[in-house]
Amino acid sequence: MNHYIDHTLLLANATTKQINTLCDEAHEHQFFSVCINPDFVEHCAERLNTSNVKICTVIGFPLGANTTAVKVFETQNAISLGADEIDMVVNISDVLDGKWDVIEKEIVAIKEACGPKLLKVIFETCLLTNEQIVKLCNISKRAGADFVKTSTGFSTGGATVEHIKLMRDTVGKQMGVKASGGVRTKETAQAMIDAGASRVGASASVSIVTGEAPTTNGY
């Protein structure tokens, strides 16, 4: 299970000491990546430069309400600092307003900025209908994104087995599906993987892989 996990710390009050611990835990447990806010990308890339742990960061986070130009710049800047993977929040207002062409153009622009780097599109599934989730999956696939992702972990809910199944059924085997938000136990993580998740974002990653109860609340 370890290699499914993006070991995550996205809190506003995260300290460098906590980020160092995150990196060291990811290295020790061989998690797929660390997922951190953009300001820590360069630091994590340097700390993990002799490991296989990837550097994942978030764009337009957590509301998705930045303009496309800002998201493109964020993406380019993060990659220049050492990011391997980009988790971008879709504009939820545009989804609710049905501005599908605008959404698709934004994803295309950000994927172009990513180049060969991997792009995940965050939906915030707790705010959407199943129909909207399916529509976003199809748009993300057509726009060239590599993954679809459930949640930021900062809204009214996180990943559910039902949404993971729906997303996997929609995108097929050609794309990744990331479960994030509220995945805090080994049993929950395994349920997400069994439902079709190819990546799991979690702050309780060490507890998940050791089977121990998480000691704090988090992503």
From Swiss-Prot:
Catalytic reactions of this protein: 2-deoxy-D-ribose 5-phosphate = D-glyceraldehyde 3-phosphate + acetaldehyde
Active site per the UniProt annotation: 87 (proton donor/acceptor), 149 (schiff-base intermediate with acetaldehyde), 178 (proton donor/acceptor)
Q: Does the keyword Cell cycle apply?
A: no
User: Which Pfam families does the protein's record reference?
Assistant: DeoC
**Compartments where located:** Cytoplasm
Q: Which cysteines are joined by disulfide bonds?
A: none
GO cellular-component terms in the record?
cytoplasm
Which BP terms in the Gene Ontology apply to this protein? 2-deoxyribose 1-phosphate catabolic process; carbohydrate catabolic process; deoxyribonucleotide catabolic process
Cite the EC number. Answer: 4.1.2.4
Picking any one GO molecular function of the record gives: deoxyribose-phosphate aldolase activity
| Pathway connected to this protein | Carbohydrate degradation; 2-deoxy-D-ribose 1-phosphate degradation; D-glyceraldehyde 3-phosphate and acetaldehyde from 2-deoxy-alpha-D-ribose 1-phosphate: step 2/2
What CDD domains would the database entry show? DeoC (cd00959)
- Show the InterPro entries listed in the entry: Aldolase_TIM, DeoC, DeoC/FbaB/LacD_aldolase, DeoC_typeI
Q: Keywords of this protein's UniProt record, alphabetized? A: Cytoplasm, Lyase, Schiff base
Kindly give the NCBIfam families that the UniProt entry links to this protein.
Answer: deoC
Question: Family, per the entry?
Answer: Belongs to the DeoC/FbaB aldolase family. DeoC type 1 subfamily.
Briefly, what is this protein's role?
Catalyzes a reversible aldol reaction between acetaldehyde and D-glyceraldehyde 3-phosphate to generate 2-deoxy-D-ribose 5-phosphate.
Q: What is this protein called?
A: Deoxyribose-phosphate aldolase 1
This chain's source organism reads Vibrio vulnificus (strain YJ016)
